[in-house]
Amino acid sequence: QKEVGTNCTWNINHNMRIQTTELDGVLLITPPVMHEDFRGTNTEVYNDAVYRQNGINYNWVLDSISTSRRHVLRGLHGDSHTTKLITCLHGSFYFVVVNNDPTHPQYRQWESFTLSDKNRLQVLVPPKFGNGHLVMSESVVFSYKLNAYYDRDSQFTIKWNDPEFNIWWPIRRPILSERDSAG
């Protein structure tokens, strides 16, 4: 870090933290706060060179932003070929990733994380994994990067409370779309 004034620092080293998780291929990433002072922070959410230096080599083709309100549960969605990078920009949500590859030894195993604008965590979700989120704050804004365009034919939906997956959610009666209710 470099001092640039009273109560003001710049992180010029791009100190990104990458952690493996219990699920093969799923990564938990903490991007660096580049600048912090009495006005707030500036976080570098994505820097292609830094991600590539850390072995995250994807050609992202689509960035989307999603908003939801408290107790909305979206998911669990996925497909056979897309990698996603999920980032919470405002609020907080309970995020679940589940292995949906029947040929993999971790099939039906899942892991959860809390993503928020405070902890800055990102989750890298590989192909053949479903993911879903439950909004815990009043509202949430999150972004996701995709390395492939939407392909309806390769999509799958896992019912949020499917007993075969036995996923724990913090509430029992979330707000669901028709698609997510049906699974």
Predicted regions located by residue number:
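Acidic, Ala/Val/Gly-enriched low-complexity intrinsically disordered segments
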Residues: E3-V4
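Non-catalytic, conserved peripheral segments adjacent to functional cores
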Residues: N15-K118, S139, L146-G183
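Conserved metal-binding segment of the jelly-roll/cupin
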Residues: L115-E138
